[in-house]
Amino acid sequence: MERILQNFSDYLMHVRRLSDHTVVAYVGDVKQFLCFLIENDIELKDVSRLHIEEYIKKLSKQKTKLNSTSLARKISSLRSFFNYLQLTSIKDENPVEGIRNPKIRRRIPDFLLPSEIQKLLEFSMKNQRDYLMLSLLYFCGLRVSELCNLRVEDLSFSPAFVKITMGKGKKDRIVPLTSKLAEKLENYITSCGKSPEDYLFGSQIKIHPSTVFRIVRKYTMMCGIKKRIHPHTLRHTFATHLLQKGVNIRVVQDLLGHSNLSTTSVYLHVVDQEKFDAINKLLQEG
């Protein structure tokens, strides 16, 4: 069974080209399901749709109740696992086919106001590294993992852009840099004496995501922002501000590296909400 799990992990990483985080989550979900099979004396080859439904019921009834998003991911993990077993002729059919994921209520992402972003960057300017990290998260809409994986060779200054090669789904993308940010990055690289193969933040060892979280938290507290802010909030803010300024949603999709437009569309709700708020203000004033 360990060999099957390892091969499944390799399949997700090298064939499906999923992110490391997603692979770990999927394999963990499958391990949990395999424990259920052992507890109930069920052979993997004998798993039917009925067993899958029983397992989902068990997950739904456990003390620490799963939210719809977590349950949907666990079902997706099993669907991928049995697809893999079909591909490798270990199982003839996929018992998860036809089982619907629970409906997920899309939560409108939190974002910062332009004045809050300005404060955040102003407070971090005394620390060159921190300022550049926050600037890349906001002006380029990077994920934390993408920021941590950036190497000097991923940056171009003529023309000015950053190449993201380790994004979710392993899809390369190009994100332009503002002239001001490009200049500051070039000065930072020169002053630190970095080589092309060095990590931008770090050298031989990349910076840890937890460090990025601490830096974001530090400056939000310093400038008195009361919202619960994390690095991904800056990515949400990047997308929201672009849409508010009338940028085409397809362009925003490409900049974010989303494979599906529906993922980007969630930010439209933020813009729509602003319209409703504006009308409500008129009603209140009237």
From Swiss-Prot:
Gene3D superfamilies documented for this protein: 1.10.150.130, Intergrase catalytic core (1.10.443.10)
PROSITE patterns: CB, TYR_RECOMBINASE
Record: active site: 143, 168, 232, 235, 258, 267 (o-(3'-phospho-dna)-tyrosine intermediate)
Pfam family, one: Phage_int_SAM_1
GO biological process: cell division; chromosome segregation; DNA integration; DNA recombination
GO molecular function: DNA binding
Every Tyr recombinase domain range: 107-280
Example of a GO cellular component annotation carried by this entry: cytoplasm
Main localisation: cytoplasm
Disulfide bonds: none
Entry keyword annotation includes Isomerase: no
Keyword Cell cycle on entry: yes
Domain Core-binding (CB): 1-86
Keywords from the named record: Cell cycle, Cell division, Chromosome partition, Cytoplasm, DNA integration, DNA recombination, DNA-binding
Location in or out of the cell: Cytoplasm
Record's function text: Site-specific tyrosine recombinase, which acts by catalyzing the cutting and rejoining of the recombining DNA molecules.
Family membership noted in the UniProt record: Belongs to the 'phage' integrase family.
Protein name as catalogued: Tyrosine recombinase Tlet_1492
Organism from which the protein derives: Pseudothermotoga lettingae (strain ATCC BAA-301 / DSM 14385 / NBRC 107922 / TMO) (Thermotoga lettingae)
